[in-house]
């Protein structure tokens, strides 16, 4: 997870945490961007959101929103927050499958 300063002109926050969801091959490639899921303090309990919190390196309870994927420049991913646990990563994988309507 990374905190990104000024993520977009439409985002009211000065910074936002994002989780990189691109595959490692893309992350390690010469492509300049990666796909990320934003983290918001709102949690609606839907299957495409993954609850995260202090135990994941955040200041307060939040959720990863897999329905709102964005492409971010790799150069903006400089403020490392932390990694997801294996259990949380499995929850994220399931939420991504649901959000993208992918079976398997």
Where are these regions (language model features)?
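Conserved functional hotspots at enzyme active or ligand-binding sites that engage polyanionic ligands
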Residues: 1-104
């Amino acid at each position: 997870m990374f905190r990104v300063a000024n993520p977009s002109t439409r985002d009211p926050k000065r910074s936002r945490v994002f989780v990189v969801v691109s595959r490692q091959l893309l992350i390690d490639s010469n492509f300049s961007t990666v796909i990320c899921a934003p983290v918001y303090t709102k949690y609606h309990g839907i299957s495409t959101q993954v609850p995260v919190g202090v135990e994941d390196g955040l200041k307060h309870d939040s959720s990863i929103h897999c329905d709102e994927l964005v492409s971010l420049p790799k150069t903006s991913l400089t403020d490392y927050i932390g990694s997801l646990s294996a259990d949380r990563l499995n929850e994220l994988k399931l939420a991504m499958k649901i959000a993208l309507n992918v079976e398997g």
